[in-house]
Amino acid sequence: GERILVAGGRNPFDLGKNGTSPTLGLSPDDFVILLTHTPDYAEDVPVTNSDLILAGHTHGGQVTLFGLYAPIVPSHYGQRFLSGLKYNSKNIPMIVTNGIGTSQKAIRMFAPAEVVMIVLHRLTD
């Protein structure tokens, strides 16, 4: 396709109201970027026609043991979607960022704040 489309859900925590991905009605010929607050959404909801998923919510664990393990991760999937390039069960790439904020406690240990720049390149034959 010729287009890059950006889609997102309103509240990824309320699957009763938002349990249908906005990407389902989009063309598989377009490159679709799905924005979601939590990476769990990309696993709990069929995100058909998504080519790239961008998520946050985990803060990279916020407080980790030397960046290797986070005792508390706000995800049903534990360490699986902690931070970085991940793939959901449908093998769709998902970038989970640490973000720049914190949750209830304004502290970070071995989970630095980050702003991620993503550069897309057209595939050539």
State where each predicted segment sits.
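Binuclear metal-dependent hydrolase catalytic cores centered on His/Asp/Glu-rich metal-binding motifs
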Residues: 1-36, 42-44, 48, 105-109
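Beta-strand-turn-beta hairpins that frame and shape the catalytic cleft
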Residues: 1-8, 27-31, 87-94, 120-125
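Conserved beta-sheet core of the metallophosphoesterase superfamily
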Residues: 39-117
